[in-house]
């Protein structure tokens, strides 16, 4: 079990692992933020990826969301971080988002599948965590 995780089944941690597998050279910082600015049309924004001039990437996820919605918004923003600011919501971004979804589900299967004996302690789970420096 990963002793660094507060929730042993954290979907945010699982998404982080998926992102690092798909985009190992891209670094980001993420925050929950209650006051994300509205978009240019005055519409509420639930997530934001900021690409600073110095190359730093910061992701913000609105705190008003359910966990399920926040995870989806986080994945959406991670896709932006993975493909870069110039991609917007084009095919390259969509592929990154879909790949994150697939990798996230693969990680879930590795970590929690009944085919792993016992669950939570499977070899693939331990290897994934060790490769990422979590254990």
Language model regions located:
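Active-site recognition of the HExxH zinc-binding catalytic motif
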Residues: 72-84
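Metalloprotease/metallohydrolase-associated module, dominated by Zn2+-dependent proteases
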Residues: 2-68, 85-135
């Amino acid at each position: 079990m990963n002793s660094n995780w507060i929730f042993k089944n954290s979907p945010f941690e699982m998404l982080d692992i998926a992102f690092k597998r798909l985009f190992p050279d891209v670094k980001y910082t993420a925050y929950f933020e209650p006051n994300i600015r509205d978009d240019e049309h005055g519409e509420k924004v639930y997530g934001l990826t900021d690409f600073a001039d110095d190359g730093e990437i910061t992701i913000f996820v609105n705190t008003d969301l359910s966990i399920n919605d926040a995870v989806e918004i986080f994945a959406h923003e991670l896709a932006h971080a993975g493909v870069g600011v110039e991609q917007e919501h084009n095919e390259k971004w969509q592929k990154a988002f879909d790949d994150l979804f697939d990798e996230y589900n693969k990680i879930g299967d590795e970590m929690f599948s009944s085919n792993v004996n016992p669950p939570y302690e499977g070899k693939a789970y331990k290897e994934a965590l060790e490769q990422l420096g979590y254990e």
